[in-house]
Amino acid sequence: VRPMPTISETNYDQFDFCEDVHKLMCRRVKKTLTTKGLFYRTKEMEDKYPNIEFISKVKEELSEVKHRIMLYDLCYLYSMDKGDNIEMRSMLKAMYSDHMDAAHEQKALRLGDHPLLDHKLVTIEGDEKLKVDDRMLQLLYGDAAEAFLTIVKKLDRYSFVAEINKAFYNPRDFSMRGNPFAKMHEA
């Protein structure tokens, strides 16, 4: 059996970095790493890879390591097709051993007073889900981000009406669904 080849540091990129931060969070969950240890090791890794543009841009955006860790983990989960609606509570429980620290962070997110929201890196779906925003995708993917960004189609007046019709009309039973103008339609 031959040993696995080592990956050269020149191939190490933002995706590898985010995966490594995620692994640290998994260790925190298993209680083999403290929250302070998670923060310290993440800073140490950031300092080890100053040449990765993604890391330096994230550090410019977010001054506190706890917010950067959240972003790195969201990036990892998104890039691994785990979805872009991540449960806020699960992520915070993975980061913090102290429930009150997690509760304060959750409160800030829910009240809209959080750096990830201020910098338009995430949005909140419902009360509990963190959704990756286009700005975060641009940080993570750089020039290739267009493949993942929400595309806003330019519609002429006819295609606009067709899109509205698709959103509200149910062709199966010829009824209107969720239409705020349904009462006007019946009249």
What do the PLM-derived regions correspond to, one by one?
Residues V1-A187:
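Intrinsically disordered, low-complexity N-terminal extensions of AAA+/P-loop NTPases
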